Amino acid sequence: MRRVLKIGHRGAAGHAPENTLAAIRKGIELGVDFVEIDVRCTADGSLIALHDATVNRTTDGKGPIDRLSLLDVKALDAGNGERVPMLEEVLRVVSGQAGLMLELKVKGAAQKAVEAVQKAEFKGPLIYASFLHEELGIIRSVDAEASLMALFGRLPQASVARAMKYSPSHVGLRHDTVTRRLVEAFHDEDLLVFVYTTDTIREIQRAISAGVDGIISNVPERLRW
């Protein structure tokens, strides 16, 4: 029987502050196949795990992340006393424990992310994901074997065609856009299909019925197989 991969969204954001080491460790504890985190750059070029363009929602600070230094970010509380981790810290925690999915949120992150992964000698499967498909192209140009996931919100045909130029191995789709026919069409192109962010039992069952290969969830303990 086909096994659907379990991916912890922002670690396991249903259990601990998103994108923190606590959330990541919880995802690993819950047995995920992959931990997914978001990657952004600070003003001084450091890669950190953060979803939004500002720190307002997820920390006790304010301001755009691209105007804050790493030192500024390290002083912030990301919830429950957790800090915003650097990518290097994430790589150390996940290496050898689970796979890692890095969602690149900004232009210019791709090359730095590849260098950080190589420097860390990360052990385990790794997927680079992005809605910024040109960033995936940068990674493909330096690593022909990298696993790349082209993320989509809606699916205009032109956007799909542009993304395919970068030879992704995976596509990431909104759970409410997925149908069996769509999944089969991507499978016919030798692409694996993951869905996000799939939290309710009904959403999970629908994704499985559509034939997806991976489910990204804030509550991965609901992925019971």
For the regions a protein language model found, what residue spans apply to each?
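Phosphate-group recognition and catalysis centered on beta-loop-alpha active-site segments
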Residues: M1-W225
